[in-house]
Curated annotation (Swiss-Prot):
Subcellular locations according to the entry: Cytoplasm
Catalytic temperature dependence: Optimum temperature is 70 degrees Celsius.
Functional description taken from the UniProt entry: Involved in the degradation of arabinan and is a key enzyme in the complete degradation of the plant cell wall. Catalyzes the cleavage of terminal alpha-(1->5)-arabinofuranosyl bonds in different hemicellulosic homopolysaccharides (branched and debranched arabinans). It acts preferentially on aryl-alpha-L-arabinofuranosides, and is much less effective on aryl-beta-D-xylopyranosides.
Chief place of localization: cytoplasm
Species classification: Bacteria, Bacillati, Bacillota, Bacilli, Bacillales
Gene responsible for this protein: abfA
Reaction(s) catalysed by this chain's protein: Hydrolysis of terminal non-reducing alpha-L-arabinofuranoside residues in alpha-L-arabinosides
Name of the protein described by the UniProt record: Intracellular exo-alpha-(1->5)-L-arabinofuranosidase
Length: 502
């Protein structure tokens, strides 16, 4: 077996930016079994007195997710937030047109805020700009963030929440460019309502940050024109523009599939260019950052979802079971987000529990980790600090849709406070190991703490509630001498090489 070689230089002064911890965010929508039967299952042996599953809470805490987007998603475009507050017995059952389900409203924003506190996350709250508009948006900010002395803040207090929730980050609707969206709008229609909603929301609470909707994915016919038009209307009043993108391996072409993170990289660069064009056009001193608030692999469950009966409570929708190659692509996508730490400040793995998720649950049964759980956990836990620009020389390959795909996808993160450097690396090679030589000349007296590897001989291998064949091991061979790290990256592997001060 031939071993290819790649080299990399990491230098503590080659800084991209401090990584905003919110890029390791996630998403919970009122969809399928994400809420009901996911985070919330009264009567489950692991449920607390409020019905929240403690086993799920522990798995989420292990991921150290700093921010969670809620309550949607397509769901939010038909959602009346008032339905989910106040006495539970008085809450209406509603038809959710987005997912053709019945919403009981047993869980609403106050219960979700309680749960988010338990897992140590802040909430990225979305407002409904589909069936509703600026009035409901300002009232929701008042209910959540105003201390007291007004109708909606006093209503929150009457509901048992004396202290305001102080939600900092808000989404101005969801995927309004999509014809599937409840209340779909043109770019001009959406740009106008988003601008007016942004103004009144910030008048209620000037400390909040706002995310305006970009395109639902890069293949939308209105992509780029949508962003330019929407930002033209909203630039002075918003802080972020959103990106959404999901990938799948429908053609069963692993080499091409693992190169899709290059498309993600190009998507990010394109949106940065559009935002900066509007900045130049407006002669603005303000820079708009990016919120990649839906990203993941999503394709396994597409056919099964067509067979689900409509108008039931918490049907098993979007329950992708992820395999090993999915974990590798998720790793490449995480590295791509880190590489753009200067502009991507928020990102949400969509979603968190049961719905295209790293965590799965069974009714009255266990919770378990999917293959994609591990790269996400490693990135979140060890990817805090400054992203360093990697100078890489790697052998390359061509695939169906891409040319010059590097076998090595890698980045290093420097945590000055902990005096640690973490190298994240994916070897895309399907046949051979890759010998990595990494020059760490600016890091004196460092040693290898550990070399974590996620590998498997079968790219289609999945985990289940009964067994977890795809799990990382700590038997990587990384060594450091003469300020050079050398490591073997097994074929098709996700690697985390942690360096610390002696």
């Amino acid at each position: 077996m031939a071993t290819k070689k790649a080299t990399m230089i990491i230098e503590k002064d080659f800084k991209i930016a401090e990584i905003d911890k919110r890029i390791y965010g996630s998403f919970i929508e009122h969809l399928g079994r994400a809420v009901y039967g996911g985070i919330y299952e009264p009567g489950h042996p692991q449920a607390d007195e409020n019905g929240f599953r403690q086993d799920v809470i522990e798995l989420v805490k292990e991921l150290q997710v700093p921010i969670i987007r809620y309550p949607g998603g397509n769901f939010v475009s038909g959602y009346n937030w008032e339905d989910g507050v106040g006495p539970k017995e008085q809450r209406p059952r509603r038809l959710d047109l987005a997912w053709k389900s019945v919403e009981t409203n047993e869980i609403g924003l106050n219960e979700f805020m309680d749960w988010a506190k338990m897992v140590g996350a802040e909430v990225n709250m979305a407002v409904n700009l589909g069936t509703r508009g600026i009035d409901a948006a300002r009232n929701l900010v008042e209910y959540c963030n105003h201390p007291s002395g007004s109708y909606y803040s006093d209503l929150r207090i009457a509901h048992g929440y004396k202290e305001p929730h102080k939600i900092k980050t808000w989404c101005l609707g969801n995927e309004m460019d999509g014809p599937w969206q409840i209340g779909h709008k043109t770019a001009v229609e959406y740009g106008r309502i988003a601008c007016e909603a942004a103004k009144v929301m910030k008048w209620v609470d000037p400390t909040i940050e706002l995310v305006v909707c970009g395109s639902s994915n890069r293949n939308m016919p209105t992509f780029a024109e949508w962003e330019a038009t929407v930002l033209d209307h909203t630039y002075d009043h918003v802080d972020y523009i959103s990106l959404h993108q999901y990938y799948g391996n429908r053609d069963n072409d692993t080499a091409n599939y693992l190169a899709l993170s290059l498309e993600m990289d190009d998507f990010i660069r394109s949106v940065v260019a559009i935002a900066d064009y509007v900045k130049a056009k407006k002669r603005s001193k303000k820079t708009i950052h990016l919120s990649f608030d839906e990203w993941n692999v999503w394709y396994h469950s597409n056919e099964a979802d067509k067979l689900i009966e409509p108008w039931t409570v918490a049907p098993p929708l979007l329950e992708d079971i992820y395999n090993f190659e999915d974990a590798l692509l998720v790793g490449c996508m995480l590295i791509t987000l880190m590489k753009h730490a200067d502009r991507v400040k928020i990102a949400c793995l969509a979603q968190l529990v049961n719905v295209i998720a790293p965590i799965m649950t069974e009714k009255n049964g266990p919770a378990w980790k999917q293959t994609i759980y591990y790269p996400f956990m490693h990135a979140s836990v060890y990817g805090r600090g400054v992203a360093l620009h990697p100078v890489i020389s790697s052998p390359k390959y061509d695939s169906k849709d891409f040319t010059d795909v590097p076998y090595l996808e890698s980045i290093a993160v420097y945590n000055e406070e902990k005096e640690e450097v973490t190298i994240f690396a994916v070897n895309r090679d399907m046949e051979d190991a890759l010998l990595l030589e990494c020059d760490v000349r600016s890091f004196e007296d460092y040693r290898v703490i550990e070399h974590i590897v996620l590998e498997h001989d079968n790219v289609k291998q999945t985990n289940s509630a009964q067994s977890s064949p795809v799990v990382p091991h700590r038997n990587g061979d990384a060594q450091l001498s003469d300020r050079k790290v050398s490591a073997t990256l097994p074929k098709l592997s996700w690697n985390v090489i942690r360096l610390g001060k002696r």
